[in-house]
C-alpha cells in the first residue's frame, strides 16, 4: 500500500466521523503511517448527513483532500446517492447491508456487511455498527493492522 483514499459516510448518530478519527489514529499512532482526516456534517444532531474522508499512506501526504476515493463505506442509503459517483472506477464499495438496499450499477467490488444487525445482536448496541464496519475494512484491505485498530478503539 502506498496510499489509500477513502470516504466513510452515513447519517448523524451512526458514528461515521468517529470511525474516520479512529482509523486515522490507528494508522498514525500504532502502525507508524501517515494519515489525514477531514469531515463534514449537516446541522441536525441525528439523522442529517455526516461524512469523513481519510487518507492513509506509507509516505508523507502532499495533498490532504480525497477527491476520488479508492473505497467508499456507506452506512446509509443517502451515502450512496451523495458519494457513489466519486468512487474510482476500480474502487470498492463497503456497505452496511442493513441500511443500504439499492446499489448503483458500475461498481465492480462490493462488500456487504450486516453491521447494524451484528452490533445489535452481539453488542446490544446498534451505534457500534461503525466499529464493525471498520473491522471489515481492516480485514478486506489491511490498511491498518488489526492490533492497531483494536488499540485505537480502546484508546
Identify what each model region corresponds to.
Residues 1-155:
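Active-site cofactor/cluster-binding pocket
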Amino acid at each position: 500500500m502506498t496510499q489509500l483514499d477513502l470516504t466513510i459516510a452515513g447519517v448523524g448518530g451512526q458514528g461515521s466521523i468517529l470511525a474516520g478519527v479512529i482509523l486515522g489514529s490507528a494508522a498514525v499512532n500504532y502502525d507508524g503511517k501517515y494519515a489525514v482526516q477531514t469531515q463534514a456534517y449537516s446541522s441536525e444532531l441525528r439523522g442529517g448527513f455526516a461524512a469523513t474522508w481519510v487518507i492513509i499512506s506509507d509516505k508523507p501526504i502532499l495533498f490532504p483532500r480525497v477527491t476520488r476515493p479508492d473505497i467508499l463505506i456507506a452506512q446509509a442509503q443517502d451515502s450512496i446517492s451523495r458519494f457513489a459517483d466519486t468512487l474510482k472506477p476500480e474502487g470498492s464499495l463497503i456497505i452496511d447491508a442493513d441500511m443500504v438496499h439499492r446499489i448503483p450499477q458500475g461498481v465492480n467490488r462490493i462488500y456487504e456487511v450486516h453491521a447494524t444487525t451484528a452490533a445489535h445482536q452481539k453488542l446490544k448496541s446498534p451505534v457500534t455498527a461503525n466499529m464493525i464496519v471498520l473491522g471489515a475494512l481492516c480485514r478486506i484491505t489491511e490498511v491498518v493492522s488489526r492490533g492497531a485498530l483494536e488499540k485505537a478503539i480502546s484508546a
